Amino acid sequence: MLITNKFVTRNCKRSRYSQSADIPLTIQGAGNRRISHSEIEKNVDVNVLRKVAPHLEESIKFRNAPKIPSDVLDMIGNRFSCVEWSDYGDRPLAIQEDMAQFLKRQLRSNYLRTFIFRSDLIDNGELNDLFIEFVKRPTFKSLIGRTGTYISSQVVIAAHQAWLSRRSFEVGTQEIRGFVTPESLSALTAQVEITWDRKPHPSVPSASEFVFGAERMADNHGVDAYCIAFAFFNKFVE
């Protein structure tokens, strides 16, 4: 259960940080020692966040592009399996530098399995390199670019090549979703067979396989692009 603008604890005693009902930060977890799920809104009370930051684990979402001081971001650890950063305005925004460094730190973490984002930061060369390393890990599960967010063809190709070389898997289904330019799609189709006008939908395959769908549509700026969905189904999971 999530309640907007409140701290919420589930299956545990009430946190001593849950007295205010006007703090745009939603939390689920086991008391104040370990908070397993957090959603941080744009106008978060930084002083309160500073108190709970060391206790955040497992899943963290930054909604509506919150601006958080670097010292608070430094207090948040790297023990997240899922990290999400998004801005729900009319168009994706570039991420502030301190937050960008935080997200890069998460991408380097061996705990991370799912990364979800909506931003123009995909054009950042260093982040693109981290995406490539991320999707090549056997623990990689999902890389999802929200509406209008571009993903480099190099990232998809790296994930595909890593998938082909594996003999065993730690994750049952792996997926990449986002937008690509027509030029990037050409690079992809040279190496991967795609299914036009149909996004792949996860199902239970008879064996390990992958599917790749592409659908032509305009991005947030009205530019001609392709929305892709690339999924690996791994039957033989360790």
Where are the regions that the model predicts?
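The conserved beta-strand core of Leucine-Rich Repeat
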Residues: 1-238
